[in-house]
Amino acid sequence: MLKMESTQQMASSIINSSFEAAVVAATSTLELMGIQYDYNEVYTRVKSKFDFVMDDSGVKNNLMGKAATIDQALNGKFSSSIRNRNWMTDSKTVARLDEDVNKLRLLLSSKGIDQKMRVLNACFNVKRVPGKSSSVIKCTRLMKDKIERGEVEVDDTFVEERMEIDTIDWKSRYDQLERRFESLKQRVNEKYNNWVIKARKVNENMNSLQNVISQQQAHINELQIYNNKLERDLQSKIGSVISSIEWYLRSMELSDDIKSDIEQQLNSIDHINPVNAFDDFESILRNLISDYDRIFIMFKGLLQQSNYTYTYE
């Protein structure tokens, strides 16, 4: 069964994208402030801080754990999701979450983020309008609930304040943005060129590997053809040897029983598989040698009974 881990992969991708966004935000802020910086140093510091915060806060493990639970549910394993559901509906869990929220509120207040800032941030979102300098303020779900509960009032008192207009050096701003754009353009071009070089090397390696595979395949085909030819030649030779032995056997003055026995052994030889044919030949030769040995023993016994001696020449 195919194991699905798409949710974990997506969660990991989101975490990695968040880190890249943090690096871009840090470098952009430094450039807008006109501060000289080393990109590698900023990258290393942001990565170290990002990894520490994500690990120490438990956010990364929490996200990956929930993603793993979803993947297990998609794979048909619901035990983890059932435990999570029971845990989320437990009164102890709710009490602990409420305690954590209170601690976060105290921490934000100690950092100078008061209730006004927290409520406004939770009630509104700002959406940029593409191609325009204006933006759209969007109400969140919390703001909608407050309106429905009558917790929103309209203040009709207006305070007229004198707006001080600062002189903005648009030329320096433009030059700064142009330098930033050129820097980003150069960085993108370098990465693109590096990727092109790597892609060409990979393509060359693939072509070389394909050529080697083609050559090896051609060599294998040649060996297969030669092997088939050799097998056919052996089959033909085996058939010729059997026919020659049968013809020679018929010209002998042996009894019909002996001839029939030898012919049966010859007919039992495998004509298709040369390996089996050689085994059959070996068996026939062993039988012939065994028969010759028995005949020699009988002949030697007759000579001894007749008081004759024999010698080898």
UniProtKB/Swiss-Prot annotation:
Annotated region (RNA-binding), positions in chain: 1-149
Region (Interaction with host EIF4G1): 208-313
GO cellular component, one term: host cell cytoplasm
Stored CDD domains: NSP3_rotavirus
Keywords assigned: Coiled coil, Host cytoplasm, Host-virus interaction, RNA-binding, Translation regulation
InterPro entries attached to this UniProt entry: NSP3_N_rotavirus, NSP3_sf, Rotavirus_NSP3
UniProt-recorded Gene Ontology molecular function terms: RNA binding
One GO-annotated biological process of the protein: regulation of translation
Keyword RNA-binding carried by entry: yes
Recorded coiled-coil stretches: 166-237
Annotated region (Interaction with host ZC3H7B), positions in chain: 170-234
Region listing for Dimerization, in residue ranges: 150-206
Gene3D superfamilies (UniProt xref): 3.30.70.1610, Nonstructural RNA-binding protein, Rotavirus non-structural protein NSP3, N-terminal domain
Compartments where found: Host cytoplasm
One Pfam assignment: Rota_NSP3
Functional summary from the UniProt entry: Plays an important role in stimulating the translation of viral mRNAs. These mRNAs are capped but not polyadenylated, instead terminating in a conserved sequence 'GACC' at the 3' that is recognized by NSP3, which competes with host PABPC1 for EIF4G1 binding. The interaction between NSP3 and host EIF4G1 stabilizes the EIF4E-EIF4G1 interaction, thereby facilitating the initiation of capped mRNA translation.
HAMAP family, per database record: ROTA_A_NSP3, ROTA_NSP3
Subunit structure: Homodimer. Interacts (via the coiled-coil region) with host ZC3H7B (via LD motif). Interacts with host EIF4G1.
Similarity section: Belongs to the rotavirus NSP3 family.
Name listed for the protein in its UniProt record: Non-structural protein 3
Lineage: Viruses, Riboviria, Orthornavirae, Duplornaviricota, Resentoviricetes
